[in-house]
Every structure is written in C-alpha cells, then in structure tokens.
C-alpha cells in the first residue's frame, strides 16, 4: 500500500465527501471517464478554496485535503487501495437501511472527531513553538504582499513542521534564494509525478549537482493527466550553486525543461535602486564610535 493511502486511512478521511461527491457513484469505477470527472470536480473546488484567494486557515486546510484527495482518487492503483478500505470501514454493505447507514456514518464521524481532539489536546505545545509558527505566518503574509505563489500546498504539513523545527533563517531566506521554479514537459520523463524519478533524471543530466539538490517539491496546481506541463520547485543547499545551475539550464536547457526561473523574481528588487544615505547615528555605530548617554 502506498504511503499517501496509508496517511489517508490513518486519518480516516472520506475523500469523496471532501470532493463533495457520493462514494456509491464512483465505487469500482476506474476508467478514464471517472478520472476525468474527479479531476473536473477537484478543479472546481480548488478554485473556490485556493489560499491565494482565501488566506484564512480553514481554506488552507481544506485546499490541502483536496490535493490529498485528488492525489489518491485520480490514480487507479491508489484509488483501488483506498476504495477497498472505504468499502470495508466507511461504507460497509451491512444490510442497514439508508437512514440507518446515514446515522451510523454520523456517529462514526463524531467518534473520529472526538479521538482527534484528544490526540491534539495531549500533544500540547510551548511558547517557542507558537513564536516560530507566528514567524512562519509572517513569511506567508510577505509572500502574499509581493504577489508570490504559496508554493507546494500538497506538502503543507511538511512545510509547517520544517518552519517550527528549524531556525527562522533556515526556513525562510536561505530556502527561498536557493529555490528554482522549473516547468517540465509531462511526457518527457517517465512517471514524472514520482520525486525519486525526477531526482534520478536530474542526477543523470546534472551529475555535478547530485549532492547539491536538497529537495524537490511539486506545485499544488499540477494536473497529472499527461496533457499539461508540470511545475516543480528545486531547492539546492547553496545559493552560488543555485545560480550556476540556473544559468546552465538557461544557456542550454535539456529537452525536458520548458522553463526555469528563480523562485524569487529579481524584478521584485528593481524598485530598490535608489540609494538612501545612513543617518549619523547609524554611521557612528558602524564606525564603533561610543554613544554618549545623558544620565541627567
């Protein structure tokens, strides 16, 4: 069983209900028409709940769950694994009437919500963690101010975990300046949606950067239907190596690359060309001139 299906089952998520669909209409259907219908519904809801339009935490959480749902249900193998669990635990054929089944589902959801609350209450927290989460929130607000996309919301939990465990510097500036936004031709790399395959491709094409690529993330807006290009964020460990890789791809892009750009556009800094002189107080501090304090 795939890791993403294990995650969904572990959280007892009803992916069909998240997509505002009836499980019975899709049970056992894995054909192209079913997949197309699921993706169409996902696109409609993703526009409604996208964090770029609705920055509230409830929208962020819902958007993350929508991405989780389409990742599982649009893949026939993952959908088959998930449907087997759904048929056994969420919607078992137990001879209950429709009204009785509805009441059973409500009780199960209430129990699951109660169990989640107990787990969350037992996890606790501390002031330092809250401070780091607030700093991460400030970062998201700055990105919204400059019109930057919010990146890969498919792995939102991973981003929050990183922001609350690393230093502020590690989770913001360094990561951003070392990130490249790459657009790939979907058909150019076999099973491009698998980060291991994409990393293997990068190692083959750019072996000199094999140990410099720190992470590979996927945009939440990707649609893995073979007809659209795929947006990927490539994070390196060193800003100098990031610049070298960027210029190397720009000069001689491999066939799989459609586009490559820095994650933070240099255009954002064009308005900072004006020189502003330092005031005398700051100049004295930089020169090491002692500051006179009036004690009267």
From Swiss-Prot:
Localization annotation: Cytoplasm; Nucleus
Superkingdom, taxonomy of origin: Eukaryota
Gene Ontology annotations for the cellular component aspect, listed alphabetically: cytoplasm; spliceosomal complex
Entry-linked SMART domains: DnaJ
SUPFAM superfamilies with a match to the protein in the record: Chaperone J-domain
Similarity comment: family membership: Belongs to the DnaJ family.
Protein name as catalogued: Pre-mRNA-splicing factor CWC23
UniProt source species: Candida glabrata (strain ATCC 2001 / BCRC 20586 / JCM 3761 / NBRC 0622 / NRRL Y-65 / CBS 138)
